[in-house]
Amino acid sequence: IVFTNGVFDLLHPGHVRYLQRARSLGDLLIVGLNADASVRRNKGPDRPITAEHERAELLAALECVDAVVIFEQDTPAEIVRLIQPDILVKGADWPADQIVGRDTVEARGGRVVLVPVEPGHSTSSILGRIRRQT
């Protein structure tokens, strides 16, 4: 089981390529998705742009995603404990000591894999371009 998590607001090619790489590491990819309230607490009151049920629907439609789990907490720690993935995937822009669930996964012999981030693809940059054009 491979697990990753995120907001995945305004799904873009960088997200898709990241998830494809994550899926290539195992037989099953489960994506933890921050609920709307969690996103607001983590990213501010103007986020997410796309509602959680729509973000979940888009993710679930991807061939590389086997399951989507929406979580209300600020971090996926509880879901990682429940799922017990063999591989935890995060973007390479995450400092190793800040990866939530790392201890849980490594304690049972699993591993954390950092996947390179696609340059030029981020929801923040998309939102910035939209704001500059309006």
List each language-model region with its residue ranges.
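Nucleotidyltransferase catalytic core that binds NTPs
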Residues: 1-134
